[in-house]
Amino acid sequence: MTLDEAIKSLMALQAKLAAYGHAMGLLFYDGATTAPKGTAANRGQTMSILSEEHYKLTTGGETVALLEFLDAHKSGLNEKQQRMVFLLIKDIRNMQKIPMDEYVAYQQLLVEADDVWHRAKETSDFALFEPVLEKIFETNIRFAHYCAPEKDPYDYWLSEYEDGLTMAQCDEFFATLREHIVPLLKKIKEKPQVDDAMLHGHFPEEKQAQLSDYLMRTMGLDLDHVGLSTTEHPFTTSLGSHFDERITTHYLEENFASSMFSVIHEGGHALYDTGSADDLAYTVLDGGVSMGIHESQSRFYENLLGRSRAFTGFVFPKLCELFPELSGHTAEEFYRAINKAEPSLIRTEADEVTYSLHVMVRYELEKRVMHGELKVHDLPGEWNYLYKEYLGVDVPDDKHGVLQDSHWSGGSIGYFPSYALGSAYGAQLLRKMKETVDVDECLKTGNFAPINAWNREHIWQYGCLKKPGALLEQALGEKFDPTVYTQYLEEKYGEIYGL
């Protein structure tokens, strides 16, 4: 085999893997959106067959031989090809350590888990979800031991979502946030509370859907390649490549802001994915490099831009057009209402000040379950205890507590810290962007093009070509510093509450 032939085979292999990913992604997306309730077992059967074929293709002798050949001749490969080979070998080595029957069974379990989670949340019954969740945690612990027996199992999964991330780093990061957020929240509680009554009323779903379309277009999303559906829990997924991106939202007719900011958040994810360089499509380099970087983009658009005074001033006339009852209010009142800082039950509805406390609860619980210090059966009680301790709120039921997120049903254990990291990354990226882009002026006129161009140049185009830490440092021109984020919060909320 010549090197040119091997490179062609490398590209063909990745196209096949992308095709399997496309098919399995469609099954997941269908299950979460429009599939009838009784079809989970049917999808699970198909998923098990596809995942088995995917496993065989990934770990097969031909694939291993091809990648070993390319690795031995990597001096003849360009930067992108070298990175492709590195990532594929990493994936193969991990997958080879997991018995195929266990891998396939786990994929089928996740299909079942998604269905059970929906039913459990609907009825607020954790006991229904408990047996499936126990299997998910047990499998994640077992797979971590297979892949990296020398590592702590929770460290292994943290690093899978954010390359190199450890519990020690998370502990230090969260300690820094707590040091600033807890006193800030205490000062806010001593001030008169912001009035957010204007956000509550009756806002027809049809009008909210029109707002979603408007927001997606304003953000610069290409609606020929990005679709929107409704689900119980909003998410974003790429199907096959960055040319087919799907986002979802959840409409609450009593609160239009819920979906508004879900769409902006998921739209940020979609901008990142669709911003990958086109020559990365159908390769392992396509899409976001880590969940921390991904969340830096989603929460950048949702909060740093979407909840800014400049953008709310721009979007408020459109809101009044869609919801005439808002016309008796001002853009400034809207800005203050959507930035009301107050402990709450639901992570996705949380303000910027308290949001990281929601993440810390999940981090602490995951860490303890992964170490055998907490039983899955005891998660609801411990969840409720930590919400009282961290946020001072009483959890009324499982639906508004331990069952609120879809992440555990999808096997995403170790994901949650990425949200808080992403918020902090985003604040530092915004500070850097403002050196060359008049961000406020862009937002006042609804012109996202210069903002998107900066993100595309510094973040999006690279896909998975660079490691997340290196990509971030290159974009920032300095080391990551979480106090940039806490300073942003202190300045913004200090002004809103007159601290």
Regions found by a protein language model. Give the residues of each.
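A well-structured
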Residues: 1-163, 490-499
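Inter-helical turn/loop segments and adjacent helix faces that build the functional surface
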Residues: 119-127, 160, 164, 187-196, ...
